[in-house]
C-alpha cells in the first residue's frame, strides 16, 4: 500500500501550490492588502511549505515521522479554519474581496474537508486490508471493504462538486 502514499503526494503538492498561488494572485489583484510584498512572501512561504510537505513524506517512517505528520495535519486544519473564516468575512471583512472569491474560498475549504474525509476512509480501508493479510478474508471484512469504498466514493463525488463550483465561480464571477 506504499504506492498510495506516493500518489497522495500529488494532492498535497496541489494544496500547497493552489494556496500559495491564490494568495499571490489575491495580493497582486488588490483583493487582500499588502500588494507585491505579500505576494513575494506568499511565494517564499509556499516554497518552504512545499519542502516541508516533501520532508513529511520522505521521513514518514523515521522516528520524527509521526510528529511531522501531526504538524502537517494540524496546519491543514488551521488553514481550513482560516479559509472558512475569510470566506465568511470573519477575517478580512473590510478587504475589497469580491463575493465570488469568498465563495471560492468556502468551496476550497470543502475540497480540503473532502480530502480529510477520504483520508479517514483510507485509514479504515488499510486497517481492514491488514487484517485480511494477517488472518484471512471473511464476509465481514469484505463487507467493510465495500462499505469503505462506497463512503470514500461518495466523498470523492462531493469533492468533484466543490471543484466544479470553484471552476464555475472562477469563470462566471457571479457576485
Predicted regions and their residues:
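Polytopic transmembrane helical bundles with strong interfacial aromatic enrichment
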Residues: 1-175
